[in-house]
Amino acid sequence: MSKNIYVKELSKHLNQEIIADFLVLQKELREGKVQYIRLKLADNSGTITANVWNNAQSISEKFKEGDVIRIKGEVRSYKKQLQLSVKKLKALDEVEFDLVD
């Protein structure tokens, strides 16, 4: 499992599990076959779409747009676009991250 990965490096980790910190630019609770969260995440190297498929409602209540979160998830390709499938997520306190990253 790779840690501290930047958006620009995600293509090197396709189908691998990563742990990384991102700023939440957008958060949307959606209904499909199941309820899920669609996220737009960013770091200083770019942005990426991410999805949270399990326990969407309860996880959605734990963070908001503008928060920095740490995710554990898998880098996937969908319709030739990279995205993250989030397995675990936690909002970080300011002391847990460096805004320069």
Regions found by a protein language model. Give the residues of each.
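Flexible glycine-/small-residue-rich
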Residues: 43
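OB-fold nucleic-acid-binding modules
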Residues: 1-19
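OB-fold single-stranded nucleic acid-binding module
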Residues: 26-38, 46-101
